[in-house]
Amino acid sequence: MVRDRPFQVVSTMPDIKRKWSFTWLPPAIRILFKGMPGVWRHRHQLVFCWLIVMQIVTSGARTLSGLSQSAPGFITEWRFRRLLSAGYWSLKVLLHWFAEEAIKSLPVPENQVLYVIADGSKKDKRGPKNPAAQKGRLNEHHAWFFGIKFVVLMVAWDDYRIPVDFQMVLPKGHPDYKKENELFRHMLSHFQPPDWAKVVMVVGDAAFAAKDNMKLIQARDKADSQRCWGFVFAIARTWNMADGKSLRNLVKHTPHSCYRKTWIPRLPDHKGRKTFWIFEKLTLLKHLGDVTVVLTKKGRNVGPQNTKLLVTNLLELTGRQVIDIYQRRWAIEILFKELKSGLGLGEHQVTKKLPRIEKSLGIALIAYLFLLRARKDDIKPGKPWSIFQLKTNFTMDLIQKQFQHSMALEINKWKKAA
């Protein structure tokens, strides 16, 4: 007796579960890598180009294994890993080149004012073998974390925000440990503003309001005859004036009648305006000289504890202009969110050596700069924009061109077969 065999259906449709991947880079994308510094050996330049593109288009886990899923067959995880492990090429050379190209490709502001903003952030990690990972917290009101700390220097004008440099903050026990302010001065001293910038305003919170930082800005202002350098920092109340009185006494004993009401427009992604009560005073601070100190609070009857102190070395600025400049510091907080959520900063599983970790962090910044150049036409003047929207537009355009390229190859194959 012959046992009946189960009925089988042979499908003539292609297997839609088969992994789909990109196979080529369109000319519009390849031309953006043209002129890149020649630091490469072997085929690492091609692998680097695909790493940047995959860092943008990948929406899932941006580990090296995840980035290689949609890449061509010859672009594998171990090629990405060997690229990051290679010690002959310098990440900072490439980062500075991509930053310069991004600045050149964007329109020049009418007022020719460039804002240089610095701030620190962290990326959580779990691997204890990472030499850059450390335990800490931002302040006593925040929870403890374990991860990598870093400082980013960015430039901004109009609605644009462009990272130009970054430094990792090593654990305190490391022999090469440097404080955040030392890293900030290193980045600022090597930063060269574009030729169109006539005024350079350095903006930072109270963590970067160190006297050495301000002296460096004043020194660059004296040495640079082509432009004016200034700063607007939030400042601690422990600073003393030349007469020996502290700023704490100024905040505590200034009556409400001395404050005046003012307002500033909100950032482009918000409607309306912000209202503040301010008091400005020309004074002489120790180690700095003549400055303008601005006391600002959100309500007339707000107490001294909720009053913020701002300081600037440009005496011609009004209190309203000072708080409007300091408001631009929020752009770097948006940048951190876009780098971590949109471009997967620090998600590469790279450990053991610091240069590899530095390169894995810098790849996200280079991808950010590359995406700005590729989709600069999507940023409308005076309107808010997001790296998430630019990323979506870039991915959809790349998929469309990949489909057209694949169809053209199939049609040519059919023509040759006919």
What kind of feature is each model-predicted range?
Residues M168-K298, K383-I387, F394:
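An internal, acidic/charged active-site-proximal segment
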Residues L67-S68, Q112-R126, L153, V200-A209, ...:
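Short, conserved catalytic/metal-binding motifs centered on acidic residues
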Residues K122, G319-V350:
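Short amphipathic alpha-helical "interface-anchor" segments enriched in bulky aromatics
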Residues V53-M54, L83-Y160, L170, F276:
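Active-site-proximal, Lys/Arg-enriched surface segment
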Residues L345-K401:
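Basic, amphipathic alpha-helical segments enriched in Lys/Arg and hydrophobic/aromatic residues
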Residues W78-R82, G87, L138-V199, V291-K308:
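Electropositive, glycine- and tryptophan-enriched low-complexity nucleic-acid-binding patches
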Residues L95-L114, L188-W196, D212-K215, L315:
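A short acidic-Thr-Gly-centered motif at the start of a beta-strand
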Residues V2-L91:
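Gly/serine-rich nucleotide phosphate-binding loop at the start of the catalytic core
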